[in-house]
């Protein structure tokens, strides 16, 4: 019986494999105290599929899929921070709505999916915030606008093991300093929507991020 229990535990561990790395600046507390507002930018999202799966999609469709996923994740992260603000566990006064963030960027002629030519300080000045959250995200299971369903139906990956890698930066806009870097790699269930995904990504690490308590 113990043998089967051990085998089951090993299989479960393999199916839900995750790797987490967290960097926190040595003066993070000082940065947090000086932070009154933050904005979440769309992450640079890459949808990674096997060659035989790619044949059912054009390059343009893959790009659109990634852009839709980026905006969904942006909204889900905003919801995550807003929930913590309502609970009183967020140490930042204001979280800028994604619609406002994206509108300001567009009005300034900035592509919301391509802003790497600008420094965090420049983005902070344009958006009027003390902290920006940005980064990259790779997934084998897009969830936005039915993309996951389309991928399962067209590419036949409904039963495939899902994988995702998030690399998220919390950058102070006054001096371009990286205050927090959060890296997480997941292999297993990613949930059924972007809010599930963000909850999975942020699980167990929220209390270790200095902007939350």
Give the positions of each predicted feature:
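Short, aromatic- and cysteine-enriched interfacial helices/patches
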Residues: 7, 15, 151-154, 211
């Amino acid at each position: 019986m113990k043998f089967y229990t051990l085998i089951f535990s090993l299989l479960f561990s393999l199916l839900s494999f995750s790797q987490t790395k967290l960097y926190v600046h040595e003066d993070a507390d000082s940065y947090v105290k000086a932070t009154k507002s933050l904005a979440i930018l769309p992450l640079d999202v890459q949808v990674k599929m096997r060659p035989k799966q790619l044949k059912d999609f054009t390059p343009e469709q893959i790009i659109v899929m990634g852009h839709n996923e980026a905006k969904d994740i942006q909204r889900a992260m905003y919801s995550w921070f807003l929930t913590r603000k309502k609970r009183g566990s967020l140490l930042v006064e204001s979280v800028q709505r994604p619609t406002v963030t994206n509108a300001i960027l567009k009005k300034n002629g900035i592509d919301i999916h391509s802003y790497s030519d600008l420094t965090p300080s420049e983005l902070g000045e344009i958006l009027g915030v003390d902290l920006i959250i940005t980064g990259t995200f790779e997934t084998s299971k897009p969830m936005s606008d039915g993309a996951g369903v389309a991928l399962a139906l067209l590419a036949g990956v409904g039963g495939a093991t899902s994988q995702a890698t998030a690399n998220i930066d919390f950058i102070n806009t006054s001096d371009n300093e990286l205050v927090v870097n959060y890296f997480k790699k997941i292999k297993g269930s990613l949930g059924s929507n972007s809010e599930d995904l963000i909850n999975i990504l942020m699980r167990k690490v929220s209390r270790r991020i200095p902007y939350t308590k």
